Amino acid sequence: MTRRLAAVTVLAIAACAPKPETTEQMAARMKAESDAARTAIEAVNARAHRYFAAGNVDSLAIGYAEDVVVMMSNAPAIRGRPAMRAKLAELMGYGTWEMTATTTRVDANGPLAVEQGSYVMDFKAGPRAPAGMATAFPDTGKYVTAWRKVNGDWLVFADILNTDRRVPAAATKGH
């Protein structure tokens, strides 16, 4: 009797187990998740651009996860929210920045999303800009940002961006 009851219990549990997701179901779920993530991420980005324009470093830094890693062109990786906040404050202190980012794609699966996009930026040096820094320069580039949803909020946990600007040609000796 005990064996029979155990066998019936195992069969009942197996019958109640969720069916594996089909490829089509997964694609539909991920499309819906990606669409929702894109809408949310674009809203976060719009807020971040307002904070950036206003020089509000503290509000801007909150959009980064505590363990964020940011990799910018020609610079060491920035690790952690406090380091990112310090870098933002440093950069904003150099002068006036104007930036527009355009999201071109978001792929999401559960609490993770990857955003691809491009940016256009303009900089005008202020009195606290380091010696030798260009007084003004426009820039265009692209980025890939990894997002993690934490307690309902999308936070950046990895960001890599790079410029489309060409590296200046080195002076040739004797020419």
Write out the residue ranges for each language-model feature.
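Bacterial N-terminal signal peptides that target proteins for export
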Residues: M1-A6
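Short, low-complexity N-terminal intrinsically disordered segments enriched in polar/charged residues
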Residues: C16-E66, P168-H175
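Short beta-strand edge/turn micro-motifs at domain boundaries
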Residues: A17-E21, D139-V167
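Hydrophobic pocket/interface hotspot
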Residues: A48, L60-A61, V68, G80, ...
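A short gly/proline-enriched turn/hairpin at secondary-structure junctions
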Residues: G63, V69-R79, E90-Y94
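A mature extracytoplasmic/lumenal domain signature
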Residues: Y64, N74, G110, G117-M121, ...
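Surface-exposed, charged secondary-structure patches
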Residues: R85-M133
